[in-house]
């Protein structure tokens, strides 16, 4: 795992087309902005896990 330190307004790049910018830091919360191509899915981890579980669940009527 790569660990970086960033200040408000600073960014990091993933590849050539994904940018993550620190927008605000308040207490233990960090607000980030993500710029990515439309074909790249961006989800919070807990939402991604729900989507994954729903796709893996057996469908009713099959």
Swiss-Prot record:
InterPro entries: CsrA, CsrA_sf. SUPFAM superfamilies: CsrA-like. One of its GO terms (molecular function) is mRNA 5'-UTR binding. It is found in: Cytoplasm. GO terms for cellular component: cytosol. Keywords: Activator, Cytoplasm, Repressor, RNA-binding, Translation regulation. Disulfide bonds: none annotated. It holds the Pfam family CsrA. One of its GO terms (biological process) is positive regulation of translational initiation. Transmembrane segments: none annotated. Belongs to the CsrA/RsmA family. A key translational regulator that binds mRNA to regulate translation initiation and/or mRNA stability. Mediates global changes in gene expression, shifting from rapid growth to stress survival by linking envelope stress, the stringent response and the catabolite repression systems. Usually binds in the 5'-UTR; binding at or near the Shine-Dalgarno sequence prevents ribosome-binding, repressing translation, binding elsewhere in the 5'-UTR can activate translation and/or stabilize the mRNA. Its function is antagonized by small RNA(s). Homodimer; the beta-strands of each monomer intercalate to form a hydrophobic core, while the alpha-helices form wings that extend away from the core. HAMAP family: CsrA. This is Translational regulator CsrA. It comes from Pasteurella multocida (strain Pm70).
